């Protein structure tokens, strides 16, 4: 709905790429914090020449960004425009007071006969063309990976070689000491790359006998 308001066009809700937070583990939160990030569930909509891309998924956000510090009942909306650059709106999104205020505002509008269109303009004035997410050019971004592997010689070399073969370069590698024979998480962050290349590389990595579980993949928001 926010995308429809922002871009004055009907949005194909079925085309929104959605990943939840169920697969986020305490390990991810710990290593994200160690690397200088917080994990937040973000909904994003971007307008491109080919349409509007929409995603809802957890991302690593640098602690230096204001949106990283939105916690508790607070919600935030970040807007980026051609002339105003970036605007951040923060407010309470839960609780008796904020909910009552929103309901009261709607009731007052109804009593006054104020009935603006849901999306700010009538649907007849929205741009008729479909966003068609498949026509949106793919952008590049950095990624966080957590790979659970067996403690065997050459495992990391195989993973690094696979990423290299898909033109993905590494920025950070974290592997903590452990007892011999134990399974170990390997934490990687990459330089910006396409998600298509990343998922292709992970299909190969996850098929390795030394990789014990599907690799955790989270995008990293640029600072």
PLM feature spans:
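Short acidic (Asp/Glu) and glycine-rich catalytic loops that position anionic groups and cofactors
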Residues: 6-12, 80-87, 138-139
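A glycine- and small/hydrophobic-rich beta-loop-beta segment
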Residues: 76, 82-84, 113, 117-118
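Glycine-rich phosphate/pyrophosphate-binding beta-alpha loops
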Residues: 85-87, 91-97
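Short conserved micro-motifs at the rims of enzyme active sites and ligand-binding pockets
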Residues: 67, 89-91, 101-102, 158
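Structured core elements
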Residues: 40-41, 55, 78, 88-90, ...
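A conserved regulatory-domain signal marking ACT and ACT-like small-molecule sensing domains
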Residues: 102, 107-223
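Substrate-binding/catalytic subdomain of NAD(P)-dependent oxidoreductase enzymes
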Residues: 1-69, 74-76, 95
């Amino acid at each position: 709905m926010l995308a429809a308001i922002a871009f004055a066009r009907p949005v194909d809700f079925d085309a929104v790429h959605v990943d939840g937070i169920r697969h986020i583990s305490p390990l991810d939160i710990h290593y994200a914090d160690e690397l200088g990030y917080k994990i937040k569930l973000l909904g994003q909509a971007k307008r491109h020449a080919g349409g509007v891309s929409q995603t809802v998924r957890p991302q690593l956000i640098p602690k230096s960004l204001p949106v990283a510090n939105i916690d508790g009942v607070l919600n935030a909306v970040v807007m980026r425009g051609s002339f105003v650059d970036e605007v951040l709106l923060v407010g309470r999104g839960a609780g008796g007071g904020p909910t009552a205020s929103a309901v009261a505002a709607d009731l007052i509008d109804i009593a006054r006969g104020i009935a603006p269109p849901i999306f700010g303009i009538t649907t007849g004035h929205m741009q008729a063309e479909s966003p068609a997410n498949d026509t949106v050019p793919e952008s590049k971004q950095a990624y966080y990976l957590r790979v659970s592997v067996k403690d065997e010689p050459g495992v990391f070399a195989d993973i690094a070689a696979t990423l290299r073969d898909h033109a993905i370069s590494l920025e950070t590698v974290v592997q903590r000491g452990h007892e011999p024979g134990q399974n170990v998480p390997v934490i990687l962050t990459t330089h910006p790359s396409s998600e298509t290349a990343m998922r292709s590389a992970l299909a190969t990595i996850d098929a390795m006998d030394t990789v014990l579980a599907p690799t955790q993949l989270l995008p990293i928001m640029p600072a």
